[in-house]
């Protein structure tokens, strides 16, 4: 659903989107390409990652790997890269990174599992903060390495 002032538009009934009972969804809009929208959909038969190139008017299912929605009943988080229109992160027990718009993903781990939230610096996509069951970890190299959660100073 999108909102423009007081008007709302339901996007999940548009062409190409999953039909039937829809569970928890994760949504991300590319800050680089504003009409690109991703939706991770919990659905018994049609669950997976959907992408729209026209602001949600039409959708295509681009990935149905189960690992991406392993805990859809618990949390489903998507994060669009702040510099790369094809960059997308899916958080779960592990986290998954796509560099091809969501068609494929590489799986990675921060020092602790059960990844819940991710912040990507708007001006530098190499600076990130991952929030998980162990606290928070910082990366300055796009997730190639992460700070430890042991003895990390907090304010």
Please annotate each region the language model reported.
Residues 1-155:
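Beta-propeller blade termini and top-face loops
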């Amino acid at each position: 659903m999108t909102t423009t002032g007081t008007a709302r538009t339901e996007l999940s009934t548009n062409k190409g989107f999953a039909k039937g009972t829809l569970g928890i969804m994760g949504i991300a809009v590319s800050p680089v390409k504003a009409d690109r929208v991703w939706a991770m959909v919990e659905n018994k038969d049609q669950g997976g990652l959907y992408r729209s190139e026209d602001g949600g008017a039409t959708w295509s299912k681009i990935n149905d790997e189960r690992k991406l929605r392993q805990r859809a009943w618990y949390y489903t988080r998507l994060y669009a890269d702040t510099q790369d229109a094809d960059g997308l992160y899916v958080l779960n027990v592990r986290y998954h990174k796509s560099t091809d718009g969501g068609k494929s993903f590489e799986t990675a781990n921060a020092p602790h599992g059960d990844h819940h939230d991710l912040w990507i610096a708007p001006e530098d996509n190499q600076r990130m903060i991952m929030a998980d069951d162990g606290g928070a970890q910082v990366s300055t190299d796009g997730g190639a390495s992460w700070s430890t959660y042991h003895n990390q100073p907090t304010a």
